[in-house]
């Protein structure tokens, strides 16, 4: 376990670049003083933001890059134009070279996945990486994956996701045998496509001692906390994520409007202010920011591109926790134990951007 956690940041990533990344890193540093940052991007822009954060400046090293991956770049274009010389690539490469323990970027999802996969490669037995994140539920938190790394997936791919997600839940939630469910349109065994039904059969046949497969989980089961780990292919997983985030913002706006409609509601809000603040915090998507790319020979964390500084800080916190929990080692150990259960299959599936 390293004394210092070394975090490489793609300072040019996201909708706002250094104006969000640098203040966000400063917020996270305040919570984790044992962090050293490598900041990749336009040195002039980075230094301008660092001037307002002397503690972060002291804990950082700036590495200038001339190329930044645009949010609208296709993965193939980003690889061709930004391989080796972009802020995103160099931040990932720092993990490969063991100069950093984790990479965090708010940049283009498809480009980040393509570069991470190309630079770091996948773990043995893993055909494609997945994006996993913790999801607030009525029972605490669950790990949900894949949230949009790739589209589609056969039964073996879903099985690999279940194994990796269970390893992540075991580490984060200190569970000896987390429950695992497959996201489906119904809980009955006859529901869903051939791939998901076959995946369920494979997971039941494993009879794993490291997780408890409970079968299918419907969409509303995610928020209910029906399982410690919810597994889906990336298309449905990303839709579920965006729908939940949109619903949270919609409800927050409804509450704000209702509480400011009349003088009576305003007085009522004053009496219930603490409860409403707790609800707002629970529903804030920024506080669940930070998806982990599972299945790579290194740790990469993806932040929402449009997040604010506080939201980006939470993504940096996720990266910090993954290093301190030694997640990569734990996943490797789990995959090695279950090596016979995994069969990597080549795939040309499109990366979600």
From Swiss-Prot:
GO terms for biological process: fatty acid biosynthetic process; phospholipid biosynthetic process. Its main location: cytoplasm. Keywords: Cytoplasm, Lipid biosynthesis, Lipid metabolism, Phospholipid biosynthesis, Phospholipid metabolism, Transferase. It is an enzyme of class 2 (transferase). Pathway: Lipid metabolism; phospholipid metabolism. Its EC number is 2.3.1.274. It catalyses: a fatty acyl-[ACP] + phosphate = an acyl phosphate + holo-[ACP]. SUPFAM superfamilies: Isocitrate/Isopropylmalate dehydrogenase-like. Gene3D superfamilies: Isopropylmalate Dehydrogenase (3.40.718.10). It is found in: Cytoplasm. One of its GO terms (cellular component) is cytoplasm. The keyword Transmembrane does not apply. GO terms for molecular function: phosphate:acyl-[acyl carrier protein] acyltransferase activity. InterPro entries: FA_synthesis (IPR003664), Phospholipid_synth_PlsX-like (IPR012281). Catalyzes the reversible formation of acyl-phosphate (acyl-PO(4)) from acyl-[acyl-carrier-protein] (acyl-ACP). This enzyme utilizes acyl-ACP as fatty acyl donor, but not acyl-CoA. Homodimer. Probably interacts with PlsY. Belongs to the PlsX family. HAMAP family: PlsX (MF_00019). This is Phosphate acyltransferase. The lineage of its organism: Bacteria, Pseudomonadati, Pseudomonadota, Alphaproteobacteria, Hyphomicrobiales.
């Amino acid at each position: 376990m390293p004394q210092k956690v070394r975090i490489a940041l793609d300072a040019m990533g996201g909708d706002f670049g250094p104006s969000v990344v640098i203040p966000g890193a400063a917020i996270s540093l305040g919570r984790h003083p044992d962090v050293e940052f490598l900041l990749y991007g336009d040195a002039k822009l980075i230094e301008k933001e660092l001037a307002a954060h002397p503690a972060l400046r002291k804990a950082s090293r700036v590495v200038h890059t001339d190329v930044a991956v645009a949010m609208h770049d296709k993965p193939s274009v980003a690889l061709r134009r930004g391989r080796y010389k972009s802020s995103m690539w160099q931040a990932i490469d720092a993990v490969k070279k063991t100069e950093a323990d984790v990479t965090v970027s708010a940049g283009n999802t498809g480009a980040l996945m393509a570069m991470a996969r190309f630079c770091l490669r996948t773990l043995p037995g893993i055909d494609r990486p997945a994006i996993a994140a913790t999801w607030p539920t009525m029972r605490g938190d669950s790990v949900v994956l894949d949230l949009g790394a790739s589209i589609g997936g056969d039964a073996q791919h879903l099985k690999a996701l279940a194994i990796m997600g269970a390893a992540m839940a075991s580490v984060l939630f200190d569970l000896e045998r987390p429950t695992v469910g497959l996201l489906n349109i119904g809980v009955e065994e006859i529901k869903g496509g051939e791939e998901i039904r076959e995946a369920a059969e494979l997971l039941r046949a494993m009879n794993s001692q490291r997780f408890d497969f409970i079968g299918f989980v419907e969409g509303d089961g995610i928020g209910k906390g029906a399982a410690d780990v919810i597994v889906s292919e990336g298309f449905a997983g990303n839709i579920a994520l965006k729908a939940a985030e949109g619903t949270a913002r919609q409800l927050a706006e409804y509450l704000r409007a209702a509480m400011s409609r009349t003088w009576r509601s305003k007085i009522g809000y004053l009496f219930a202010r603490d409860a409403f603040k707790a609800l707002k915090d629970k529903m804030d998507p920024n506080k669940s920011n930070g998806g982990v790319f599972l299945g790579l020979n290194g740790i990469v964390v993806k932040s929402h591109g449009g997040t604010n500084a506080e939201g980006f800080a939470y993504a940096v916190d996720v990266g910090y926790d993954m290093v301190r929990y030694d997640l990569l080692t734990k996943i490797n150990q789990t995959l090695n134990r279950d090596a016979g259960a995994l069969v990597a299959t080549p795939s040309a599936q499109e990366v979600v951007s």
